[in-house]
Amino acid sequence: MEPAVSLAVCALLFLLWVRVKGLEFVLIHQRWVFVCLFLLPLSLIFDIYYYVRAWVVFKLSSAPRLHEQRVRDIQKQVREWKEQGSKTFMCTGRPGWLTVSLRVGKYKKTHKNIMINLMDILEVDTKKQIVRVEPLVTMGQVTALLTSIGWTLPVLPELDDLTVGGLIMGTGIESSSHKYGLFQHICTAYELVLADGSFVRCTPSENSDLFYAVPWSCGTLGFLVAAEIRIIPAKKYVKLRFEPVQGLEAICAKFTHESQRQENHFVEGLLYSLDEAVIMTGVMTDEVEPSKLNSIGNYYKPWFFKHVENYLKTNREGLEYIPLRHYYHRHTRSIFWELQDIIPFGNNPIFRYLFGWMVPPKISLLKLTQGETLRKLYEQHHVVQDMLVPMKCLQQALHTFQNDIHVYPIWLCPFILPSQPGLVHPKGNEAELYIDIGAYGEPRVKHFEARSCMRQLEKFVRSVHGFQMLYADCYMNREEFWEMFDGSLYHKLREKLGCQDAFPEVYDKICKAARH
């Protein structure tokens, strides 16, 4: 009884403290208390529920039977919207706080919400090497199932809660993208419900214009109801090499060289300052040296970016064997390095051993409990951006990031961008090697002002024919946005499919004014 009594006393004291200080004060100044006592246990309950649900649904093979009925229900909702006069635009009914993006869309309150309850894996076809999934299937679900049967996605984006729909309608990337491209480039078919309630399937050879226009469109051409994605044979481990590199010129040269080597299954860099980085290259393998096995996904292990930093501090190269699923979700426990700002002692060994099994808190729950004051503070004093620029511009880009926002660590992830129709493609007619530069954290540039600094960064990205990931704050005006993205095919299909009265334009969903 004593532990229960102690816990009850602590909870009572905490509630009294909240009453005296005010909930907003606690959420802003001692947010870690709220996160540790409430959000971590709640996140664990969410994870257990969704894991058990997905396992039961797949084992009973009920998802394919239910899928057709759910799609018909979506079509019915769209047709009812038309019969009622199509008075407002449509959007998905999923609450904005459930998404992984930093902001919540204001349009959810004014648009017609179409409920889309599609969160299951429908089929794994190992002969055709295809997995067919619904749009709300998460990367955590995908890895749990596929790796257990010896398969994986060629590109498997990092965070557990990222959904297939978000990765298609937005975008997704991983350290294998230098071989396979973005997430959209491993998809072979999309199934959608259009503005008139009709159902359509599109592939590179069937309804190809729609197939190439869907990625990055943020649900403004139709409602995604299923996708077919390539799968490849998996191996048990990733043989990962760590190489610290000093000097910006050497970093850029080494990273470019490793990104061009197709024998590397994975390439990633963590930049800890403008002239200090660790470059990691990996290959999948079934063989392991037991003395070099590192199960980095175990809850008591150090956060991955801190583990990598040790190679830089000691200026030594390293070789480790990491279980494949642990590698895929190596940044999940620390949400890259964002969790250090929420739970400052989160990487402390004592905290990891006692509470690490509950980490991380759900990003959706962090958003839900953010509050307006904290949201404004984050906007002015926190940056979460992914900018995609040609690899040949890497050195120039890193100088620009240093001058405009000065955030470290910086994530470096290469990808090949094919010359295909759609919103995003290289400037020329051939595939080109690009790099995702991810900046997440508190800017250390003097007199940082979010709007002016980010507009300066966006201007640079446009000037080198780069792209901004659309989950992040976008300060561009409409003209600048369409200078960055190729809207020719997109606008043609919007008119052809009757989307102009059914869905907002993509800019109106992602611009700063559309989110809070």
UniProtKB/Swiss-Prot annotation:
This is Delta(24)-sterol reductase. Its cofactor is FAD. Belongs to the FAD-binding oxidoreductase/transferase type 4 family. FAD binds at T163, V164, G165, G166, L167, I168, M169, G170, T171, G172, I173, E174, S175. Residues 58-234 form the FAD-binding PCMH-type domain. The keyword Membrane applies. Its main location: endoplasmic reticulum. Pathway: Steroid biosynthesis; cholesterol biosynthesis. Residues 23-31 are lumenal. Keywords: Cholesterol biosynthesis, Cholesterol metabolism, Endoplasmic reticulum, FAD, Flavoprotein, Golgi apparatus, Lipid biosynthesis, Lipid metabolism, Membrane, NADP, Oxidoreductase, Signal, Steroid biosynthesis, Steroid metabolism, Sterol biosynthesis, Sterol metabolism, Transmembrane, Transmembrane helix. SUPFAM superfamilies: FAD-binding/transporter-associated domain-like. GO terms for biological process: cholesterol biosynthetic process; skin development; tissue development. Interacts with DHCR7; this interaction regulates DHCR7 activity. Its EC number is 1.3.1.72. It is found in: Endoplasmic reticulum membrane; Golgi apparatus membrane. It is a single-pass membrane protein. Residues 53-516 are cytoplasmic. The lineage of its organism: Eukaryota, Metazoa, Chordata, Craniata, Vertebrata. One of its GO terms (molecular function) is FAD binding. Residues 1-22 form the signal peptide. PROSITE patterns: FAD_PCMH. It catalyses: cholesterol + NADP(+) = desmosterol + NADPH + H(+); lanosterol + NADPH + H(+) = 24,25-dihydrolanosterol + NADP(+); 5alpha-cholest-8-en-3beta-ol + NADP(+) = zymosterol + NADPH + H(+). The chain crosses the membrane at residues 32-52. The gene is DHCR24.
